[in-house]
Amino acid sequence: IGAIGLGSNFRAALPSREELMGKLRTPNSRRMFAIRQAMLVGFTLEELHEITLIDPWFLRQIKEIVDMEGQIRDFALANSMTPDNPEMVAVLRKAKEFGFSDRQLAEMWKKPEGDIRALRRETGTVPTYYLVDTCAAEFEAYTPYYYSTYEKGDEVQTKDCRKVLILGGGPNRIGQGIEF
């Protein structure tokens, strides 16, 4: 669908409430973006629930992301975006914990994506890795795999033995039930 995230087109003008009503009523691949826009123009969570019939819990989760987007953008407009600014480092980390990509941050902060990546690396804002418990804690997994996150901590256990890296593409994802 050509989106880089929930706020896929940060510079676009927001539609009117009337335009959004039509976009919100019918489930489709673009409705999530209309929900974001509706939140930005002032629809309440109750209104969105009535129109979309989406559970309020999910709407609150989306609202948290939309609110964080605003905080990230506003911070960049009012503050120095340099690695020696501890507040900027905290906002950058929080943005990554919320799942904002370097490309999204570049769009919001009107900077090249490479500058965001360099800033992130310079401030130590890098992903960590957590183990996917494929055996439901019943026994030790001998072929563990990991997912990346920006949460604190790291569960990777390095060993002094030969290693194999499997690169692949396609529809395989965590939770699909395909074990390697």
Feature-to-residue mapping (PLM):
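ATP-dependent carboxylate/acyl-activation modules
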Residues: 1-180
